[in-house]
Amino acid sequence: MDVKSVLSNAFAMPITSPAFPMGPYRFINREFLIITYRTDPDKLRAVVPEPLEIGEPLVHYEFIRMPDSTGFGDYTESGQVIPVSYKGVAGGYTLAMYLDDHPPIAGGRELWGFPKKLANPVLAVHTDTLVGTLDYGPVRIATGTMGYKHRQLDLAQQKKRLETPNFLLKVIPHVDGTPRICELVRYYLQDIDLKGAWTGPAALELAPHALAPVAALPVLEVVEARHLIADLTLGLGEVVFDYLGQPQANAR
């Protein structure tokens, strides 16, 4: 393979059989259980990178079922998204996500900078309850429950919430272990067809784990729960802040 061929095929690894395809990345019947809770403000501040800013000490704990996604297949993920603002615009910062499918782990980390790890999340309806669970190895570290479709939410309002920007801290090391990429990435969910939105009584339990520290942001109070079903496209990202380009980086 000559240099020109290497460059023309340089999208993902292995170069002869990439772990994930090129987009666009469309999701059909993507189902969310989002439980918003109040947490310790000091602990929250310690995990949100500048220049993002936090307001109320809230966390969205998410269980997401994706039965039909372009190139990524059928999988489920779970994790924490923190409401933030960047230059006065409200959005969400993804702290960590845990999922059960390699292509979106590889693609998520390499393309956007999603902080993804391999685990075993489940989202399913049990009789009258929507139940989300997350196991890391043999350990149950998250359980979320919501009464199934107790009350319908306004679709236009919920769609607007899905359209806000999302932020990721993309970190990729150089071959010597020093940072090669350290960037704040912004992306959007696009072409959203919100098919349903509901709320109901909810509860969330998080358990400590050394390698999956979801409980490091403790649940002090559940303030909201949402069950959403939508078709959408996961848009590609843009770099809004380069940490290695800052004066502090040269002083390391």
From Swiss-Prot:
Residues passing through the membrane, by range: none
Signal peptide: none
NCBIfam families named among the record's database cross-references: PRK02265.1 (NF002614)
Keywords noted in UniProt: Decarboxylase, Lyase, Schiff base
Annotated gene: adc
Keyword Aminoacyl-tRNA synthetase belongs to the record: no
Reactions mediated catalytically: acetoacetate + H(+) = acetone + CO2
Membership in a protein family: Belongs to the ADC family.
InterPro entries (UniProt xref): Acetoacetate_decarboxylase, Acetoacetate_decarboxylase_bac, ADC_dom_sf
GO function terms (MF aspect): acetoacetate decarboxylase activity
The EC number(s) this enzyme carries: 4.1.1.4
UniProt-annotated catalytic positions: 116
Protein function: Catalyzes the conversion of acetoacetate to acetone and carbon dioxide.
Protein name per the record: Acetoacetate decarboxylase
